[in-house]
Amino acid sequence: MDDKFTTLPCELEDYPGSITCPHCSAQITTAVDHVVGKMSWVVCTAITLACLPCCCIPFLCNSTKDVRHTCPKCKQAVFVYKIL
């Protein structure tokens, strides 16, 4: 596994950021994609205990998902901001 994820600035959170892509060396603004992560499952479990029909809500809300930053030029993942 490439260790390039750890060398990126920590300013990348849930919004696009300007960086130099560690894969293609282009100066880019990252593309963001919200993906299901641990926080989505934790909130789903908590909601299931209270109201079973509402358990899918965390999978529809971006605020509970991890954020994957990708390079729009080479399409490689450059950073994943994990909520939990």
From Swiss-Prot:
- Principal localization reads host cell
Membrane topology field: Peripheral membrane protein
Spell out the residue ranges making up region: Membrane-binding amphipathic helix: 39-61
TM region positions? none
Q: Which GO terms describe its molecular function?
A: zinc ion binding
Which positions in this protein are listed as binding Zn(2+)? Answer: C21, C24, C71, C74
Q: Which residue range or ranges hold the LITAF domain? A: 1-83
Superkingdom of the source species: Viruses
Pfam families named among the record's database cross-references: zf-LITAF-like
Question: Where does this polypeptide localize?
Answer: Host membrane
This protein's UniProt keywords: Host membrane, Membrane, Metal-binding, Zinc
Kindly indicate whether the keyword Metal-binding belongs to this entry: yes
Q: Does the keyword RNA-binding apply?
A: no
Q: Which InterPro entries match?
A: LITAF, LITAF_fam
SMART domains xref list:
LITAF
Instruction: Give the record's GO CC terms.
Output: host cell membrane; membrane
Q: What is this protein called?
A: Uncharacterized protein 075L
Q: Which organism is this entry from? A: Frog virus 3 (isolate Goorha) (FV-3)
